[in-house]
């Protein structure tokens, strides 16, 4: 299992917010977008902040998760721990120290 750890600088949107360290779990089909890492360790106050971080640090991963308007793609699900973000506060879901964000793309076939 490959894990990438980073220290994140805050941008204008997160400067006044309390940031915490969380883990983002990257599914196998998207690991090539982040150097093969299965997990990313990052600091962000919200799910939106975590997505902004991947936009800066792993743009191809971001483009796989979000569309050109910044919305999460329809076939991608984001969970914080065991709760889907849509069942919480969407992208504004606050993160707590040690939370795990899981990227889960839909699987289809026939």
Predicted region positions:
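Ubiquitin-like/PB1-type beta-grasp interaction modules and other compact soluble beta-rich domains
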Residues: 2-109
